Amino acid sequence: MASISTTTWLYRGQVCTDSGKSSNCIVQRRVKCGFPLKTLHAGITSRDRSLRHCIKCKKEDGDGDVSEGSKKSEEGFEYVTVERHPYHSYMDSTSGKLEPASGARASIPGEDYWPEGTSSRVRAARAPQPAGESSSFPSYGKNPGSRRKKNRKATEENVTVETNDEVSDSEDSSEEEENDSSDGFVTYKNEFEREEEETGFELDKKLGRPHPFIDPTKKKQIEKTLTSDESWWNWRKPEKEQWSRWQRRRPDVETVFLKAMAETGQVKLYGEEPTLTETSLYRARRHLFKEERLQAERERLAKEGPMAFYSEWVKAWKRDTSREAVQKHFEETGEDENTQLIEMFSHQTDREYRIMMGTDIRIKRDPLAMRMREDQIKQIWGGDPVYPTINYIQDPNAVMDFRGPDFHEPTPNMLSYLKENGKVISREMHEALLTKEKTEQLEVPDMDDAMAQAVDIGENDDDEDDADVEKDDEKVPRNWSVLKETPELRTAKPKPKKEGRMSLDEAVDDAENLTDFLMDFEEETDP
């Protein structure tokens, strides 16, 4: 390093001293030391003029800037100022390692990609330290508005700020900043009063503290459960409006649980069936409701004791399970409470154990689900799981429709709904309609001469047989096989013969049963 007599510099892998050759060494830095330094002469060669930019790390006073500016013009160096980051690395909570705060490996995105609210928090964290001294301890939000401009006057009288006469420029600039900041704000008269009013529920809601869902001062208590006809939304029932009847959810996990909670008294419903609004509110808070039930179970276990608490799941245990009986049994036989519990659980069936413990002993069972009735269980888990016939998986994010007054009505039965609208009739009505219908009369047209001549197999060549055939079958019907089975249709009126040329469709209709006639005729003529 440097001694007092001579100064040694290590620059770009070369050692330079003031006594040695200094033509290959360029120094652009001020060194502040506690001992005097000799003047260092730096020579510049033509090779050094084409060097890269020098980076200026910190500003000096104004005189230094002027001299450096002249140096820039003389020596041809361009100074580039780089704003340094407030910190070089930080502890990333995701990876648990030190991450760089800037550069290609930095995991902090730009401000454009920050989530909502991050910019304001960063801006608040970068706020300068207040100049004055606090005369009291912080209230942590208990008296809001205490730091406003109206209340600042009282604290400013007690604060004495020591200023230094030497730094006059910084004083002027700070005064100008204070004036600018005071001029930039507008204070309304009722702002302080509004801040004072925000206490309790409003303040908790604003600051994000835990608060009830509805303001306790404005919440109306439910006196009694109303029927569906007495509810306020049922004031007018449309006669033929069918869409609202389908707004009721089918009984699934949420509706059945909510109705069971209303039966146990944990919540109160406005009607007989839970509405869509009540179901969505329960879905958002079902974890809190379960925690309430588990807390009630823990309190009951501490109050009654484990013997009385767990005897609910051992039906075969008929002894007294009160605390007095357990203590008396301990005094008589010397068996403590754990031994009596083991004795009681030895009488527990497999089904009772599965209901009490569930599939995983680490997961606390829901007391409401453990004590559900059989009909409630069938409403949730009934039917075929492969092809569900009772309960279907419903969309939890379905958009609710509150247009009608009776959206809370239960879903109607599909068959009765179709019967009401005349879309479906019963089997008895169908058979009655069939008996009333007349038998359809089939019209038998005359056979054309050309068609009769075309049907000739050639087996009967005798003239006598031909004459008999002409007498018997003077009028050959079109659907011969049908007339053979139902001879009463032969008396029907013949179809009027069309004159003139026939279209293609009419010709096809006229000859549709020709093949049937030929096949039937062939069966009769077989030997």
From Swiss-Prot:
Result, substituting D516N: Reduced transcriptional transactivation activity of PIFs target genes (class B) and hyposensitivity to red and far-red light due to impaired phyA and phyB signaling. Altered chloroplast biogenesis
Recorded superkingdom: Eukaryota
One Gene Ontology cellular component annotation held by this UniProt entry: nucleus
Motif range (Required and sufficient for transcriptional transactivation activity and to trigger PIF proteins degradation): 512-520
Knockout-associated phenotype: Seedling lethal without exogenous carbon sources. Decrease of total chlorophyll content as well as a decrease in the chlorophyll a:b ratio. Absence of grana thylakoids. Altered expression profiles of plastid genes. Disturbed expression of many PIF target genes, associated with the accumulation of PIF1 and PIF3 failing to be degraded in the light, and leading to long hypocotyls. Impaired in phytochrome (both PHYA and PHYB) responses, especially to red and far-red light, such as hypocotyl growth inhibition, proteolysis of phytochrome A and phytochrome-interacting transcription factors.
Chain ranges for the short sequence motif Nuclear localization signal 1 as given in the UniProt record: 204-211
Chain span(s) of sequence motif Nuclear localization signal 2: 235-242
InterPro entries assigned: PTAC12
Spans annotated as PHYA-interacting region 2 (PIR2): 252-352
Keyword Metal-binding listed: no
Localization (cell): Plastid, Chloroplast; Nucleus
Recorded GO MF terms: transcription regulator activator activity
Broad class of the protein's primary localization: plastid
Bias type Basic and acidic residues, positions: 485-504
Residue span of region Disordered: 89-188, 458-527
Entry keyword set: Chloroplast, Nucleus, Phytochrome signaling pathway, Plastid, Stress response, Transcription, Transcription regulation, Transit peptide
Annotated segments matching region PHYA-interacting region 1 (PIR1): 1-115
Biased composition range(s): Acidic residues: 163-181, 458-471, 506-527
Expression tissues: Mostly expressed in cotyledons, leaves, stems and flowers, but barely in roots.
Transit peptide: 1-30
Free-text function comment from the UniProt entry: Involved in plastid gene expression. Acidic transcriptional coactivator necessary for the transactivation of many PIFs target genes (class B genes), particularly during the regulation of hypocotyl growth. Plays dual opposite roles in regulating hypocotyl growth, preventing it in red and far-red conditions, but promoting it otherwise. Required in the nucleus for the initiation of photomorphogenesis mediated by phytochromes (PHYs) (e.g.
Complex formation: Component of the transcriptionally active chromosome (TAC) complexes. Interacts with PTAC14 and PTAC7. Binds directly to PTAC6/PAP8 in the nucleus. Interacts with MED14. Binds to SL1/MTERF3. Binds to photoactivated phytochromes (e.g. PHYA and PHYB) via their photosensory domains; these interactions stimulate its light-mediated accumulation. Associates, via its N-terminal region, with phytochrome-interacting factors (PIFs) including PIF1, PIF3, PIF4, PIF5, PIF6, BHLH72/PIF7, UNE10/PIF8 and PIL1. Binds to RAD4. Associates with MRL7/RCB.
Alphabetized PANTHER family for the sequence: PROTEIN PLASTID TRANSCRIPTIONALLY ACTIVE 12, CHLOROPLASTIC
UniProt protein name: Protein PLASTID TRANSCRIPTIONALLY ACTIVE 12, chloroplastic
Highest classification ranks of the organism: Eukaryota, Viridiplantae, Streptophyta, Embryophyta, Tracheophyta
Chain's gene name: PTAC12
